[in-house]
Structures are given as structure tokens and as C-alpha cells.
């Protein structure tokens, strides 16, 4: 007898949605399409030769380690390297504070598994990272959404949501995905103080913090938390769990991220990871360590910044040249994305259908809102990625997209002749 599989699925799977971005990427595989949809790093800046050399060296010198099971916590030299690397941003951690994960997406899943019971409330930004909503929703999270503006999360709107006692808050302070905004230093202090006042942990997701193209680096929340607690003894206690990744600085295909947290939190996460995949690939961790060593990672990040800064500037210039004046957008100081706001009455989902016919793709904004976080607000927004397309492709793609935008806006009200 054939199994009726749908009757066997766990209750927690019923609310799971496919990633809108993963679905869009199927469309963008067509060669004629210029895609601003995925958050893809530029493949031409991958250090491919460095990886080839590292793979050969690891297999020649340490195959007995690279091809064997490893510690769940991760490859110790890599954990030590990460601790040294993040120290330059003021994060005082030891290797015992670092857990290597299979990308920061696994880190989000492990945190959801650790902290969320069905029905627990999680405070998130509106809009926020789609992958976090997917990870947390599996464990039955309800959401409390707080809006963002050009300075990031509205800290003046945090007190009442925090007073209601969410399990934790999830924030992306640097060059937020999807908005491209950065949480101001003043708001960072306010957020940390309020979280401490109400005893709410913070999950600080920082995949883009090293990709700053202008301005000064701002202190991570985890650093401000240490200052607030008046502790200078390393990362023994604290209210912040910090996440980051090699996906945006080396390559996403190696699937390596990390969690930095107090040892008692790391030990519980280690137990959960053991049940998930035992450990992240030993071979890949050793290769990544070999690639990043001898100051290569720092120099490579400088290259990435130059490339992405140029592409951001090209996109901003093209938007100014081609888009109608009633359409606005953010001017990110780093990261991979900018956020476009259409006038009232416009619909990014319908715009996408028109854009497809012009062979250009983006991500409509509604998928970046929690179910109770006013997703209808997202229908006036679209996320554009500027890292993966070449400057010439960006210019052409924005021109194509402007044609689709003008067609939709003409349906709302006639445009001046010069803008058609």
C-alpha cells in the first residue's frame, strides 16, 4: 500500500514556505535575464587559485585529519583564527566561545532549536532576513515586528514590545538584509540598555559587517553589551549571541559560519549540532583556514570592498538616471543590497511580472516581513542586489527595470512626457 505522506508530516512543517528567493533563482538561470534577486557574491572575486592550492596542501600534508571525523565545535586552528579576527572589532572571545556551523543559516536553525518553543514570541525587524523567518518558523515562533527607518531598527518603539517578554530579539545591525540600512551608534546603545533592562537576549547577525565602503565601523552590539555589564574578562557571560560567516568574504559554497556566545550557550548548541550533522566538514574547515591565513583574508576583503563599492555606485547612478522621481531608495554604506520604495498604490508583485517580460529580476518586498509584521507594507518595496552583476549589466538591468516601473506607474497616474 502506498504511503499517504502528507498525513505523516509533522505539524511543525505545515507552516513552512519555500524561499521566495530560491524560487526566483530558478527563473534567473535563463541567460537573457539580468538578476538583482539573489544575495550572491561576485563569483569573479572568489579566490579560486588560493582554494586550489589550499586543497592540495591539506590533502598532501594532513589527509589523516582532513578526511576523518572531527570535533563538533570545529577545527581548533580555525576557531582560534576567528577569535583573533573578530578581536579587531572589539569582540573579546576565545576559541571556546566559537562554534563552527554549516553556514550562518545552520546557526539560525540551531538557535531556533535551542530557544524557541511553539508559540514563543521573537522580536524581529520589519523588514528582516527571510532566512531567519524560515528557520525560526519551523519551531513555531510567533513574531513581534518593529519597523526600521534610515537609521535601522526604531529603538523608540522597542519598549512596549520588550515589556511583553519576547524570547529573544533578532537584529542585523550592519547593512541590513533587505534594507541596506545600518543601526546608528546611538540606537545600538539604546537597544542594548533596553534588552538588559527587560532581560531579553539579542541574536546579532552580522554577515555584512566587514563589507563597509564608507564611514567608520560601528561597535557590535556584543561589544556594547560587555561595556554595559562592565565586564572585561573575555566572553564568559553576556546577553548577546553573535553570528557571522565566510560566505560573503571567501565563498558561500564552502558553507562555513560561526556562532560566538558564552561557553554555557556554546555547550548546548554543540549538543544540538551533534544531532544535526555531527560537525561541519573537517576538510572544508582546514581548507578555509589555509586560505585565510597569513593575512590573506584581510587583503581579500579590501579587494571585495573595492569591487562592490563600484557596483553600488553604478546602481545608484543608474537609478537616479532612469527611475521616476516618486520612486525612492536607500543609499547603503556597505553590504550587498538596496531597498526601493514605490509610491502608494504600486505593487511590487505585479511589477515583478512586468519585469520578467523585460528580462530583469528582483525580489518583491513582502517576503521579508513576518506574517503579523504588516507584509502588505512590503508590496511597495523591492530588494535589489548589486554585488553579482557587472557594472554594464547593472546599467542595462536598471534601464530594463525602469521600463517596467514606468509601465506600472502609468496605470496609477499619467507620467510626464519626458519620463516615459
Regions found by a protein language model. Give the residues of each.
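A non-catalytic, amphipathic alpha-helix used as a structural packing/dimerization or gating element
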Residues: 77, 268-271, 302-314, 400
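Conserved C-terminal alpha-helix-loop-beta "cap" of PLP-dependent enzymes
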Residues: 265-266, 270, 340-383, 391-396
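Conserved glycine-rich beta-strand-loop-beta hairpin in the small C-terminal domain of fold type I
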Residues: 289, 306-316, 328-341, 353, ...
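Conserved core of the PLP fold type I
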Residues: 58-199, 203, 209-234, 241, ...
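PLP-dependent enzyme catalytic core of the Aspartate aminotransferase-like
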Residues: 1-2, 235-236, 357, 373-420
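N-terminal "arm"/small-domain region of PLP-dependent enzymes with the aminotransferase-like
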Residues: 2-71, 357-360, 379, 384
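Generic structural signal for small/hydrophobic residues in well-ordered secondary structure
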Residues: 24, 36, 51, 82, ...
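Conserved core segment of the aminotransferase class I/II
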Residues: 228-306
Amino acid at each position: 500500500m502506498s504511503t499517504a505522506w502528507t498525513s505523516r508530516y509533522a505539524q511543525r512543517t505545515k507552516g513552512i514556505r519555500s524561499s521566495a528567493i530560491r524560487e526566483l533563482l530558478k527563473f534567473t538561470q535563463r541567460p537573457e535575464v539580468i538578476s538583482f534577486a539573489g544575495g550572491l557574491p561576485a563569483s569573479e572575486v572568489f579566490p579560486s587559485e588560493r582554494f586550489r592550492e589550499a586543497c592540495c596542501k591539506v590533502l598532501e600534508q594532513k589527509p589523516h585529519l582532513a578526511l576523518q571525523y572531527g570535533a563538533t565545535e570545529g577545527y581548533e586552528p580555525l576557531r582560534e583564527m576567528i577569535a583573533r579576527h573578530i578581536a579587531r572589532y572589539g569582540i573579546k572571545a576565545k576559541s571556546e566561545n566559537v562554534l563552527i556551523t554549516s553556514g550562518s543559516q545552520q546557526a539560525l536553525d540551531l538557535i531556533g532549536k535551542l530557544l524557541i518553543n511553539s508559540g514563543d514570541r521573537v522580536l524581529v525587524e520589519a523588514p528582516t532576513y527571510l532566512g531567519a523567518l524560515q528557520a525560526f518558523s519551523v519551531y513555531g515562533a510567533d513574531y513581534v515586528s518593529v519597523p526600521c527607518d534610515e537609521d535601522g531598527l526604531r529603538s523608540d518603539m522597542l519598549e512596549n514590545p520588550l515589556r511583553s517578554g519576547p524570547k529573544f530579539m533578532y537584529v542585523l545591525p550592519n547593512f541590513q538584509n533587505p534594507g541596506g540600512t545600518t543601526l546608528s551608534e546611538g540606537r545600538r546603545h539604546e537597544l542594548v540598555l533596553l534588552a538588559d533592562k527587560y532581560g531579553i537576549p539579542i541574536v546579532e547577525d552580522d554577515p555584512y559587517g566587514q563589507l563597509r565602503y564608507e564611514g567608520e565601523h560601528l561597535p557590535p552590539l556584543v561589544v556594547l553589551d560587555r561595556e554595559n555589564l562592565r565586564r572585561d574578562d573575555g566572553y564568559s557571560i553576556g546577553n548577546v549571541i553573535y553570528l557571522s560567516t565566510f560566505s560573503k568574504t571567501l565563498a558561500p559554497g564552502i558553507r562555513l559560519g560561526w556562532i560566538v556566545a558564552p561557553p554555557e550557550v556554546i555547550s548546548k548548541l554543540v549538543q544540538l549540532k551533534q544531532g544535526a550533522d555531527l560537525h561541519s566538514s573537517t576538510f572544508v574547515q582546514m581548507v578555509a583556514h589555509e586560505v585565510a591565513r597569513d593575512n590573506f583574508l584581510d587583503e581579500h576583503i579590501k579587494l571585495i570592498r573595492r569591487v562592490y563599492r563600484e557596483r553600488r555606485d553604478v546602481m545608484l547612478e543608474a537609478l537616479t538616471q532612469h527611475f521616476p522621481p516618486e520612486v525612492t531608495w536607500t543609499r547603503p554604506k556597505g553590504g550587498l543590497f538596496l531597498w526601493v520604495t514605490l509610491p502608494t498604490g504600486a505593487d511590487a508583485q505585479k511589477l515583478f511580472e512586468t519585469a520578467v517580460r523585460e528580462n530583469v529580476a528582483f525580489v518583491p518586498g513582502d517576503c521579508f516581513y513576518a506574517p503579523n509584521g504588516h507584509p502588505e507594507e512590503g508590496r511597495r518595496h523591492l530588494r535589489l542586489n548589486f554585488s553579482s552583476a557587472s557594472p554594464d549589466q547593472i546599467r542595462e538591468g536598471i534601464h530594463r527595470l525602469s521600463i517596467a516601473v514606468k509601465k506600472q506607474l502609468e496605470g496609477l497616474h499619467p507620467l510626464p512626457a519626458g519620463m516615459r
